[in-house]
Amino acid sequence: MLTPIIRKFQYGQHTVTIETGMMARQATAAVMVSMDDTAVFVTVVGQKKAKPGQSFFPLTVNYQERTYAAGRIPGSFFRREGRPSEGETLTSRLIDRPIRPLFPDSFLNEVQVIATVVSVNPQINPDIVALIGASAALSLSGIPFNGPIGAARVGFINDQYVLNPTTDELKESRLDLVVAGTAGAVLMVESEADILSEEQMLGAVVFGHEQQQVVIENINALVAEAGKPKWDWQAEPVNEALHARVAELAEARLGDAYRITEKQERYTQVDAIKADVTEALLAQDDTLDAAEIQDILASVEKNVVRSRVLRGEPRIDGREKDMIRGLDVRTGILPRTHGSALFTRGETQALVTATLGTARDAQNIDELMGERTDSFLLHYNFPPYCVGETGMVGSPKRREIGHGRLAKRGVLAVMPSASEFPYTIRVVSEITESNGSSSMASVCGASLALMDAGVPIKAAVAGIAMGLVKEGDNFVVLSDILGDEDHLGDMDFKVAGSRDGVTALQMDIKIEGITREIMQVALNQAKGARLHILGVMEQAISTPRGDISEFAPRIYTMKINPEKIKDVIGKGGSVIRALTDETGTTIEIEDDGTIKIAATDGDKAKHAIRRIEEITAEIEVGRIYAGKVTRIVDFGAFVAIGGGKEGLVHISQIADKRVEKVTDYLQMGQDVPVKVMEVDRQGRIRLSIKEATTPDAEAPEAAAE
């Protein structure tokens, strides 16, 4: 008999239910978490033993959305879900980031978390539900895990923080922030904002962390009732004697190596020291484990770098804690792109381009929460050569997708609306060198490339990565961190924004004890760094260029009566196809009668506008037009009078005398003046040649097209 154990509680405006014991009983732990009809089934499986020779913690998180959750069948050829979407990849990373630091350092057993969305309410995003589920399942499993964690989404509407806003509420919000953490510490923040102050951003983080305590309390209560026994796992005892011997041989030499400011030269020297020490120790005692020596060397290396920072000594590359590396900013470096920039900060460099397209270049995204169209794309590429390595080149990896989304969040708040700038915009950041914070270099490069392309962004934006080294109550916040400082430090804290405020904030914290004071120091230090970078960027380009590139399509907008849309499209699209072929333009029509004409040549666009005006012009009864015979029938002739319109000249209206045979008077393609006699309710036009050729008739209005 299946007996579920259920925990139900109120979480802001929503009711959350966590249920275990019903399904996937062969997994290490499984929970079904629901929040107002959005339900995510989360399983955890942990291997009891680590693989021999395992040197890293093999945690994988897979978040997957099933279309049946929204009552739909996949639209793919095989009618089933395929490879993970960008959204699924981003949510997998969102779950991974706060749980990874909570496993013991020496725990190397394989752990897999799978979160499957099985029911979705379009108003409730499944990502927070999945995070709560992962936390609950890991806490129930008995696997060594220093959780649970809580998770919350925070909005900012009418100057008030809103807990877990609905999809509709988020449209009105100036902030979309996700925060996750334990009872005592924030571990992860991911956000985008509409240029908010540092105080408002920090307030949102603190608000979200306070509110999520109810989640942690209820998971703890569920674990007390249904939790599995804790694993009998003990960390391998540290070989103190070997640690002391390694430190004696390597510490001073590694300290000298970390005074080499050039990255590749430093890496070469560090690798040589590690190889020498390992070889010397194995020569003395061949029973030693080379992998254990390497682990101890990594620990000594970390201690060398951290202790120097905490003592207030210069950093790896000789900088003080709040110094920014040298900047080099260039725009317009690629002649045929619509906009380009090369942004260099120390040994981190991004080549960024901006391309302008039409509405049909926009990305149509079919998500579980509904379909949407994205007219601003930002893609981030991290080729192996940027760090002096060889490797696979192909489709983007999880990291590239995540960094691209962060850079996009940083720029999104300053992008013009579709009515202000009716283009689809694609920004691509090619990381050509990397030594710390390439995603923030992408934000700076994107801002520069967009201005170079003539995109009327509201303000320039820049990004900076901050780091932290903390031991006890002693802490140092580092500005513009290197890759090594990111790896060996306790926090990765990225902030993007304009002179007026923050547009994106991302935090990943590896330790507990990060207080509001520390986050405040980091945010304030980041603001100073951001303003410094913006000052240098403004020397290269301070405002968007007045015109777009000569190689970019020009988009002209006109408005017609929505009732005339059918005339412009024509039967089966015949008229609009003929128009695009004739004028060499791209024409897009919206339901409200807005027409967008894209052309690289202004004259072609003007020609298309003129033709559309002719097609949509009202036919005036009593006016004489120049027409062309298009069809001859027994009872008269059809005559085109321009703009794709055609009327009938009845046989009785061809001449003043009786006409026995139409072809005696008219031939196909013949130009004739015609007078509009009537337009009936169905839009049919009755014409007369006889009335147009009377002595007192006025001159014809226009030539037929």
Curated annotation (Swiss-Prot):
Gene Ontology terms describing biological process: mRNA catabolic process; RNA catabolic process; RNA processing
Keywords for the protein's UniProt record, in alphabetical order: Cytoplasm, Magnesium, Metal-binding, Nucleotidyltransferase, RNA-binding, Transferase
Keyword tRNA-binding found: no
Reaction(s) catalysed (UniProt annotation): RNA(n+1) + phosphate = RNA(n) + a ribonucleoside 5'-diphosphate
Residues reported in the UniProt entry to bind Mg(2+): D486, D492
Superkingdom of source: Bacteria
Record bears the keyword RNA-binding: yes
InterPro entries: ExoRNase_PH_dom1, ExoRNase_PH_dom2, ExoRNase_PH_dom2_sf, KH_dom, KH_dom_type_1, KH_dom_type_1_sf, NA-bd_OB-fold, PNPase
GO cellular component: cytosol
NCBIfam families: polynuc_phos, PRK11824.1
Known partners and oligomeric status: Component of the RNA degradosome, which is a multiprotein complex involved in RNA processing and mRNA degradation.
Name of the protein described by the UniProt record: Polyribonucleotide nucleotidyltransferase
